[in-house]
């Protein structure tokens, strides 16, 4: 069983949301998965459509981080069949206490902290204690190495594209309003 730990997941729209959605969908074809994701308005309808379990964590951001970590740590203690944790961000793993295999995705913006700074030390504490670090570009890999991440742990996987079969009508309507609307 795999755990996917993310702060960004559909129905919220965005690049990271799409990436984590595609990753969760693909992993669910290989093994049983459970996703721990931040709460989003309207998630109930979306969550009903997937073939895997999604646990949403709500609350104000600073407390949500601790609450989510507590739920994940408890889940790991009760589910010995979890073999791997895949996280969207180093912060998603910061408070996870386990010796299970961990994989963390990185993007340059989230690790670009001055070498030796408190944030840099937190990043290194997490990333140098995971099994694999997945950088989204060679630029990000170089930056990670420059700030102190162990190069042997880093693999570059460039983001892919998940073409949709049909554009939702409300998105088409919104695009039409923008394109055909009055000039401001």
What are these regions (language model features)?
Residues 1, 181-184:
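Charged active-site motifs of nucleotide-sugar-dependent glycosyltransferases
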Residues 6-13, 19-64:
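N-terminal strand-loop element at the rim of the active site
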Residues 85-86, 129-137:
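A short beta-strand/loop micro-motif in the catalytic core of glycosyltransferases
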Residues 86-92:
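Short His-centered aromatic/hydrophobic patch
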């Amino acid at each position: 069983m795999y755990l996917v730990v993310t702060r960004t997941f559909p129905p919220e729209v965005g690049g990271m949301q799409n990436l984590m959605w595609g990753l969760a969908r693909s992993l669910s074809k290989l093994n049983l998965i459970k996703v721990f994701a931040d709460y989003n308005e309207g998630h109930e309808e979306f969550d009903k459509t997937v073939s895997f379990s999604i646990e949403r964590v709500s609350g104000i951001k600073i407390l949500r981080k601790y609450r989510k970590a507590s739920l994940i740590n408890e889940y790991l203690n009760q589910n010995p069949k979890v073999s791997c944790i895949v996280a969207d961000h180093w912060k998603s793993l910061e408070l996870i206490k386990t010796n299970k295999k961990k994989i963390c995705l990185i993007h340059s913006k989230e690790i670009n902290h001055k070498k030796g700074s408190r944030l840099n030390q937190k990043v290194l504490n997490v990333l140098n204690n995971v099994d694999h670090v997945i950088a989204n570009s060679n630029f990000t890999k170089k930056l990670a190495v420059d700030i102190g991440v162990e190069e042997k742990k880093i693999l570059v996987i460039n983001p892919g594209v998940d073409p949709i079969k049909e554009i939702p009508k409300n998105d088409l309507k919104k695009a039409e309003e923008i394109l055909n609307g009055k000039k401001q």
